[in-house]
Amino acid sequence: MERIFCVPYSLYPGYGNMLRLGQSGLSEPRQPHWRQTNVPPTFLARPRLLMPSNASDCCVDPYKRAQLMAVFSHMNPGLSLRLRKANTKDVGVQVSLRVGKSVQCSLGPRTLDSLSPWASAGHRAPASAWGVSSSVPGHWGEVRLREELSDPPEAGQPPPPLPPPSPPPRSEEDPPEELQPREELVEEDSSSPRERKSKPAPVDSSQPLGRPNFQFLEPKYGYFHCKDCKTRWESAYVWCISGTNKVYFKQLCCKCQKSFNPYRVEAIQCQTCSKSRCSCPQKKRHINLRRPHRQELCGRCKDKRFSCGSIYSFKYIM
């Protein structure tokens, strides 16, 4: 009985075995070769742990994984199974039935940080003070996606300077030096309230405002004018960068396919009252605010069905 090595943990089906070690003349019990069987792998209690090639199939099952973690915790507390880093990217995709394009957003590649207990804590990026986080229930727990909206600091940027040391405490022998700042405070308090309002508030220029590193798009009313074939038509679905008249998706002329359009872009609103919904009796030109892409300029939109929802739909993954 002294030569029988007992495993300190409870035996699970398919895990562990009782072997006779150090006994001369006795052969080890024969077991089927693990390469020729499809059963779960058998881990033998030896000084060197044997890891079969089909161990990954057993780690997928949560129940068997818990058993395997119990085995490893008894053998070596520092030994644990680590999951691979998720390789994911955040992109913006333009879905269109008429124009087939895929545009990668300026967010660039991002990696999902896992909060599972088996994930390594060294690969996690520090969370920003101003970020967007969304929790998605996954197989191993909650996955949080964080985006740093502010620009990262430069690598060569020196650290902020330390504050100057405070002056030594003055003794009671210097009373006239203490009276001078008090007189200055009295003069500042005696100033009129108008002068106080006129003085601008101090602005800390050492902390620049954070700028987002991505751009949103919005549809604007566009004038398409071709200088080559003298064609002029209008369309409401011109995708511009939000807050500007800069066109994001450019396209060629529908007739000559030479010059880029649009020539000019403005918001979808009435030209008289500058409102999206108005009841002006006279308008500068015919604009149907409900369906602004149907215009009576060149006749290309007459008797044609256009679906506002299926032309463009832009998706942001944040």
From Swiss-Prot:
Main location: cytoplasm
A GO cellular component entry from the record: cytoplasm
The protein, known as: ZAR1-like protein
Task performed by this protein: mRNA-binding protein required for maternal mRNA storage, translation and degradation during oocyte maturation. Probably promotes formation of some phase-separated membraneless compartment that stores maternal mRNAs in oocytes: acts by undergoing liquid-liquid phase separation upon binding to maternal mRNAs. Binds to the 3'-UTR of maternal mRNAs, inhibiting their translation.
Ranges where the record places region Disordered: 149-211
Single GO MF descriptor: mRNA 3'-UTR binding
Organism: Bos taurus
Comp. bias intervals (Pro residues): 155-169
Keywords per UniProt: Cytoplasm, Developmental protein, Differentiation, Metal-binding, Oogenesis, RNA-binding, Zinc, Zinc-finger
Superkingdom of this protein's organism: Eukaryota
PANTHER family assigned: PROTEIN ZAR1-LIKE, ZYGOTE ARREST PROTEIN 1-LIKE ISOFORM X1
Family statement drawn from the similarity comment of this UniProt entry: Belongs to the ZAR1 family.
Localisation: Cytoplasm, Cytoplasmic ribonucleoprotein granule
GO biological process, one term: oocyte maturation
Quaternary context: Interacts with YBX2.
Domain comment (free text): Disordered region at the N-terminus undergoes liquid-liquid phase separation (LLPS) for the formation of membraneless compartments that store maternal mRNAs in oocytes. The 3CxxC-type mediates binding to the 3'-UTR of mRNAs.
Zinc finger intervals, 3CxxC-type: 219-304
Gene (name only): ZAR1L
Pfam family, one: Zn_ribbon_3CxxC
